[in-house]
């Protein structure tokens, strides 16, 4: 029966504690349930009832006296302040329940453990309430359980670690999680009798209690601390990525614009070429330019001013379509039977030429260049690439090339009818007819004009001579070896300093031979020498001639002037021709030759002017540029034809262009008085 009094004694303290605790209890629920205002009424029974139910079993005999003393005892009041300073009261409550009820209190500890997140969340709305209430709730637990003071030393051990992380670092995340604990806490006190109700809530609160523990608080410390950093790094990274992506897109756009412009420049649909009116000795229309383009099967035809259709070669056309561009040395050696003497076609300044037959049965001419060596391979390829793009009816087509250790070889189409030099000067050859000579002169002029004005880049031949004018079976001229002088010079410059002038004696222009100045006019001079060969039938340098007449140009200069003035060609024309020529065509050819071999390069005509002069013999085209052969003064207009006077008046601004003038000019024209007949091949 002595046990009965303690129970009533315990109940008064509990009531006293309840009476004394209401202020703290009202403050205590504020700490966990500050966010929801509805929780204060159910919360007061939250902490005392479980304490009353759990504490009686252990301290039934010993706790009554201390239980009555603690409520008024000031020591209890004094003890909380250190707890407030060191750690919040929840840790004290954490330590006391576990020993009291191992079975029923585990739900309560998570409930008591869960309030720490609300204080973590509560500091943001009411910061002062979180600091003041904890000392007041602390008296009630120690008053009810004096026996746990032995265990209280253990909480301070975790408490030093807990206060710093909980109050300082956890505020941001708990607000989202603190909503669930308050909602669960009021439900638990509302159902005090049934203990099973907190049990289903425990798993929900355990994940919440994990972040609030000492170790979990450290985890929380890392999470919030890292999340702002991640957000900051994320924003900076996003900005950097955006800048990089913008630069990439900008570079792609610039590259696209550049490629489109480059493609427009190299568009195979735009064809450029040399426009030539139909000639009396030209081949059928459209055959002036042959295009070998692997990209387009049939290049478009463009109509010239005279109404004739001409095919134009593209500047970026590659090698001959559907054919190889590179050959091995062994293959070319096999094709030419080991470069045997029986296959030797000739030998020139750049090397020997051998005849060969490819595996597909195509006949080719293999030129083995004297220039070689391992150096200069890049320059050789560059020049070969330029040459391979040149395709014209009057130019020999380059089929391919070979670069070996010490060898450089070029493969051309084989032209079966030998060279102009062979047909003009070889002993025992039949005399070339005048019509054949005119055809050869016109074709060679077209090919050289194409090199000078329509190739990109323009090509200066540097070694135009009769042995480089090849003839096919119909005696159409094809210019060979163009670009080789440039290749030789580039390759020589890589091995040693070369100052030698490319060319053949007797064909070289005087300014090029003396000073090395190179221009298109040097090729014009060489072509003039070829015209003199066609007219006279003599070699450029003939040692069998009397002293002083070895040079063809120097011997022909005075005769050219006399032939133009007197229209007498007997002393100048090839004796083997006799009178088998057309005077009008002979006059025009003599005039063109005299203009091409002038001493002054500036006074020489362009090859396009020579082409027009040879193609339009019935028209009055002035290619003399107002100069007599061998003179350096301007023609006197009173001594010239009416056409020249008309051009001078147009040039110097005369406005007298009446019909009478044209009538007089046509009636007194020196060209009209001359009996001209158009030659039809």
Swiss-Prot record:
The active site is at residue 463. ATP binds at residues 345-353, 367. Residues 1-237 are extracellular. The keyword Membrane applies. Residues 1-231 are annotated as: Disordered. The modification Phosphothreonine is found at residues 499, 504. The chain crosses the membrane at residues 238-258. One of its GO terms (cellular component) is plasma membrane. Residues 214-229 have a biased composition (Polar residues). It is found in: Cell membrane. Residues 259-681 are cytoplasmic. InterPro entries: Kinase-like_dom_sf, PERK1-13-like, Pistil_extensin, Prot_kinase_dom, Protein_kinase_ATP_BS, Ser/Thr_kinase_AS. SUPFAM superfamilies: Protein kinase-like (PK-like). PROSITE patterns: PROTEIN_KINASE_ATP, PROTEIN_KINASE_DOM, PROTEIN_KINASE_ST. Gene3D superfamilies: Phosphorylase Kinase, domain 1, Transferase(Phosphotransferase) domain 1. Disulfide bonds: none annotated. It is a single-pass membrane protein. Belongs to the protein kinase superfamily. Ser/Thr protein kinase family. Interacts with KIPK1 and KIPK2 (via its cytosolic domain). This is Proline-rich receptor-like protein kinase PERK8. It comes from Arabidopsis thaliana (Mouse-ear cress).
């Amino acid at each position: 029966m002595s046990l009965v009094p303690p129970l009533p004694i315990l109940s008064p303290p509990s009531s006293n504690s309840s009476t004394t605790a209401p202020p703290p209890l009202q403050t205590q629920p504020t700490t966990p349930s500050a966010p929801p205002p509805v929780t204060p009424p159910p919360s007061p029974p939250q902490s005392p009832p479980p304490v009353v139910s759990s504490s009686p079993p252990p301290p039934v005999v010993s706790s009554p006296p201390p239980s009555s003393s603690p409520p008024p005892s000031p020591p209890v009041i004094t003890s909380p302040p250190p707890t407030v300073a060191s750690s919040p009261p929840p840790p004290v409550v954490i330590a006391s329940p576990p020993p009291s009820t191992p079975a029923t209190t585990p739900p309560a500890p998570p409930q008591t453990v869960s309030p720490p997140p609300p204080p973590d969340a509560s500091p943001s709305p009411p910061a002062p309430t979180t600091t003041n209430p904890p000392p007041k709730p602390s008296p009630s637990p120690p008053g009810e359980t004096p026996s746990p003071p032995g265990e209280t030393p253990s909480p301070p051990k975790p408490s030093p670690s807990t206060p710093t992380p909980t109050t300082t670092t956890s505020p941001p995340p708990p607000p989202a999680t603190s909503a669930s604990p308050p909602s669960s806490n009021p439900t638990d006190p509302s159902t005090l009798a049934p203990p099973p109700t907190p049990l289903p809530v425990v798993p929900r609160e355990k994940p919440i209690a994990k972040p609030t523990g000492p170790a979990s608080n450290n985890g929380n410390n890392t999470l919030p601390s890292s999340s702002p950093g991640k957000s900051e790094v994320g924003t900076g990274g996003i900005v950097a990525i955006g800048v990089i992506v913008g630069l990439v897109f900008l570079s792609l756009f610039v590259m696209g614009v550049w490629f489109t412009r480059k493609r427009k420049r190299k568009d195979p649909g735009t064809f450029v070429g040399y426009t030539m009116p139909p000639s009396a000795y030209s081949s059928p229309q459209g055959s002036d330019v042959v295009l070998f383009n692997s990209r387009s099967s049939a290049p478009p035809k463009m109509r010239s001013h005279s109404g004739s259709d001409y095919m134009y070669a593209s500047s970026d056309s590659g090698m001959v379509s559907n054919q190889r561009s590179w050959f091995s040395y062994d293959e070319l050696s096999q094709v030419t039977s080991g470069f045997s003497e029986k296959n030797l076609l000739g030998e020139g300044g750049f090397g020997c030429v051998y005849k060969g037959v490819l595996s597909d049965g195509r006949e080719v001419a293999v030129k083995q260049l004297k220039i070689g060596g391992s150096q200069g391979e890049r320059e050789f390829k560059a020049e070969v690439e330029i040459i391979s793009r040149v395709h014209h009816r009057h130019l020999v087509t380059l089929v391919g090339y070979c670069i070996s250790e010490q060898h450089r070889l070029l493969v051309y189409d084989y032209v079966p009818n030998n060279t102009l030099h062979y047909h003009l000067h070889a002993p025992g050859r039949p005399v070339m007819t005048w019509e054949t000579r005119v055809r050869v002169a016109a074709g060679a002029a077209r090919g050289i004009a194409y090199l000078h004005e329509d190739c990109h880049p323009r090509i200066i031949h540097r070694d135009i001579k009769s042995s480089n004018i090849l003839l096919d079976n119909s005696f159409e001229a094809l210019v060979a070896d163009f670009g080789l002088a440039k290749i030789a010079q580039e390759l020589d410059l890589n091995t040693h300093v070369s100052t030698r002038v490319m060319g053949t004696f007797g064909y070289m222009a005087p300014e090029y031979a003396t000073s090395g100045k190179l221009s298109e006019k040097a090729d014009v001079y060489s072509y003039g020498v070829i015209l003199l060969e066609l007219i006279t039938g003599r070699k450029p340098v003939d040692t069998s001639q009397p002293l002083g007449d070895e040079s063809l140009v120097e011997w022909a200069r005075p005769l050219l002037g006399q032939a133009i003035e007197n229209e007498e060609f007997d002393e100048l024309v090839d004796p083997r021709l006799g009178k088998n020529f057309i005077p009008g065509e002979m006059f025009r050819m003599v005039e063109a030759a005299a203009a091409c071999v002038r001493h002054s390069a500036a006074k020489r005509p362009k090859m396009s002017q020579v082409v027009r002069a040879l193609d339009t013999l019935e028209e009055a085209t002035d290619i003399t540029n107002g100069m007599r052969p061998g003179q350096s003064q301007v023609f006197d207009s009173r001594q010239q034809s009416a056409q020249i006077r008309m051009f001078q008046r147009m040039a110097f601004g005369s406005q007298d262009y009446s019909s009478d003038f044209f009538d007089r000019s046509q009636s007194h024209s020196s060209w009209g008085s001359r009996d001209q007949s158009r030659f039809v091949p």
